[in-house]
Amino acid sequence: MKKRLFVLSLILLVALDQLSKFWIVSHIALGEVKPFIPGIVSLTYLQNNGAAFSILQDQQWFFVVITVLVIGYAIYYLATHPHLNIWKQLALLLIISGGIGNFIDRLRLAYVIDMIHLDFMDFAIFNVADSYLTVGVILLVICLWKEEDYGN
């Protein structure tokens, strides 16, 4: 992926995350639940003082340090490995985008705005950035697993 496309994609993904959070705050009261796709997904405005899926509540300094380290390492890795396959680049793009999206909330608000609730299962309320992070990590694990299978 070309550097310009990567940066543009990063900006668009972070903007989508931030716009979704802005919309939730503007249209749904704190704690209110609104069906989005009935029986499947509801939107609920929640202020999360923890990490993805509400773990490690009230550890803001920890998340700031970890986020800076992970994003910094991912950017360093991309810069020092210019010929990564597209899947690894996509995985790192999602991880960086998700990290930045939640980092903006932590710096600006001291909490992260969550809003997506899966009605069909007992699961934590999460946000778009959490989705990026989750998919990015899963994709990266698959890439690394495949490399191991091929002896790389």
Swiss-Prot record:
Protein name as it appears in the record: Lipoprotein signal peptidase
Classification via PROSITE patterns: SPASE_II
Subcellular location(s) of the protein: Cell membrane
Gene name, Swiss-Prot/TrEMBL: lspA
An example Gene Ontology molecular-function term: aspartic-type endopeptidase activity
Topology within the bilayer: Multi-pass membrane protein
Enzyme class: hydrolase
Chief location category: membrane
Spans traversing the lipid bilayer: 5-25, 61-81, 84-104, 125-145
Biological-process GO terms, alphabetical: proteolysis
Record family assignment: Belongs to the peptidase A8 family.
Active site: 114, 130
Organism the protein comes from: Streptococcus pyogenes serotype M2 (strain MGAS10270)
EC number(s) per entry: 3.4.23.36
Keywords: Aspartyl protease, Cell membrane, Hydrolase, Membrane, Protease, Transmembrane, Transmembrane helix
Function: This protein specifically catalyzes the removal of signal peptides from prolipoproteins.
Gene Ontology CC, one term: plasma membrane
One Pfam entry name: Peptidase_A8
Pathway stated in the Swiss-Prot or TrEMBL entry: Protein modification; lipoprotein biosynthesis (signal peptide cleavage)
Catalytic reactions on record: Release of signal peptides from bacterial membrane prolipoproteins. Hydrolyzes -Xaa-Yaa-Zaa-|-(S,diacylglyceryl)Cys-, in which Xaa is hydrophobic (preferably Leu), and Yaa (Ala or Ser) and Zaa (Gly or Ala) have small, neutral side chains
